Design a protein with these regions (language model features):
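Conserved, non-catalytic sequence blocks in retroelement Pol enzymes and Pol-derived host proteins
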Residues: 61-69, 93-94, 159-160, 201-203, ...
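Central I-helix of cytochrome P450 enzymes
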Residues: 103, 107, 112, 164-172, ...
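Cytochrome P450 catalytic-domain helical core, especially the substrate-recognition surface
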Residues: 5-6, 13, 31-112, 124-181, ...
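Conserved cytochrome P450 K-helix/beta-meander segment immediately N-terminal to the heme-binding cysteine loop
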Residues: 333-361
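Cytochrome P450 heme-thiolate "Cys pocket" and heme-binding signature region
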Residues: 59, 234, 239, 359-389, ...
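Cytochrome P450 catalytic domain signature, combining two hallmark sequence patches
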Residues: 16-36, 52, 345-346, 359, ...
């Protein structure tokens, strides 16, 4: 049990598959801690609302829309490369914060059409509020009193949470209001915008952000309320930078420690992107061809899964692997342990991208690899995330050789809401 409450920790792929496919499970109480900030956005909602909103948001990740997002990813990656120049001096560089600010700028512009410019101005009120709000949720998650939600209202953290939520929500509502004015300055403009959307559909030439999509859809014949839109925008800001930051940083770290694998990735970049890889605008088609880089990223996500554990709760009696599971039991699906199971991945601590060749992948059972969760509630933005990770890494490796850091700065991990470094992710950068 955990905190004197019944729970089952699972790392067996067969059992995980049965849990993820069951109709009598929902997310655990942990996700309730996010509702003051995220409301009932996609990561928290259940039932018909989740089904409807998932259907509404899915078109935002059609490959035609992803091609438009690549314009943003390319630009912000170029800003990152420029910022790193001052750190390419032979000493250890903590790339984690740099990548965090880059990822925030990418998701803000993709989701809201807002240029946060976090890479230039990392101490904005909104960015700091997002960071602190995440910390409060984390502390509640590991509190001995986490099941007693009523007690939280009497704490200093609750008062601070209310202040932070106001900052974050006010920012989002202002963005929604400003975007509405841009799209619908008057009735004639509204008709013109709707006609253009109808002609181009969701997949047309017009760059469609998540916010634009939400402003132009209807549910049961009615537009979404500002509150519903804000919930989904906040959800994407919350989920859209942490995991990509870790994936990019951890991949860079592993490459810095294996010169032969790094050289093979670099050779692939030169062969497919071309000799101008340092500055060329990366396209969807080009990134899809970088198969070895994708294998490297997948191996990083195996060793360092962004979300090392996910929770589910049984809402009715169920049978798992022949055993009756009572209503109210919490399942903790241990993705980190699953990904480091020596029966699935021999010598699991060894970094080996060949595990994700087509031949090797098909031999593993279902649910043996799930860095983006699995089942119907898997990560809706996983293709977006993979494109972003590839884009940043191509730019990084085209411009810099990565060398290992000093022993004192070797990677140490901790489990927050995602898997994070204790003191940062350090590499040495050498300009190519």
């Amino acid at each position: 049990s955990l905190f004197n409450l019944p729970s089952l920790h699972v790392s067996d792929a067969k059992v995980i598959g049965q849990i993820m496919q069951a109709r009598t499970v929902e997310k655990t109480i942990v996700y309730d801690f996010m509702t003051p900030w995220l409301g009932t956005g996609l990561i928290v909602s259940t039932g018909s609302k989740w089904t409807q909103h998932r259907k509404i948001i899915t078109p935002a990740f059609h490959f035609k829309i992803l091609e438009d997002f690549l314009v943003i990813m390319n630009h912000q990656s170029d800003v990152l490369i420029e910022k790193l120049k001052t750190s390419a001096n032979g000493t250890d560089c903590n790339i984690y914060n740099h990548v965090t600010y880059c990822a925030l700028d990418i998701i803000a512009e993709s989701a809201m059409s807002v240029k946060l410019n976090t890479q230039q101005h990392p101490n904005s009120e909104y960015v700091l509020a997002v960071k602190e709000m995440t910390d409060i949720i984390l502390k509640r998650l590991f509190s001995l009193f986490r099941e007693y939600k009523w007690a939280f209202q009497f704490t200093k953290a609750h008062r601070r949470q209310r202040e932070l939520v106001k900052v974050i929500h006010d920012f989002a509502y202002k963005v929604i209001s400003d975007r509405k004015k841009q799209l619908y300055s008057d009735a004639q403009e509204q008709q013109r915008a709707q006609k253009q959307l109808a002609e181009e559909a969701v997949y047309g030439k017009r760059r469609m952000t998540l916010l634009d999509l939400l402003l132009n859809v209807t549910m049961d014949g009615k537009p979404l309320s500002d509150s519903e839109i804000r919930e989904e925008v906040d959800t994407f800001m919350f989920t859209g930078h942490d995991s990509t930051t870790s994936s990019i940083s951890f991949t860079a770290y592993h490459l810095s420690r294996d010169a032969s694998i790094q050289q093979r990735v670099y050779d692939e970049i030169l062969a497919i992107v071309g000799p101008d890889a340092k500055t060329v605008e990366l396209t969807y088609g080009t990134l899809q061809k970088l198969k070895y880089l994708e294998m490297v990223i997948k191996e990083t996500l195996r060793i360092n899964p962004p979300v090392p554990v996910i929770g589910r709760r049984s809402v009715g009696d169920m049978v798992i692997d022949g055993v009756t599971i009572p209503k109210g039991l919490d399942f903790f699906i241990m993705i980190y342990l699953l990904h480091n199971d020596p029966e699935l991945y021999p010598e699991p601590t060894r970094f080996d991208p060949e595990r994700f060749s087509e031949e090797a992948s098909v031999k593993r059972p279902p649910y043996s690899y799930m860095p983006f969760s699995a089942g119907s509630r898997n990560c809706i933005g996983q293709r977006y995330a993979m494109l972003e990770v590839k884009t940043v890494l191509v730019k990084l490796l085209a411009n810099y050789q990565l060398l290992p850091c000093e022993a004192s700065n070797q990677l140490r991990l901790k489990t927050d809401m995602t898997l994070k470094p204790v003191n940062g992710v350090f590499v040495k950068l050498v300009r190519r």
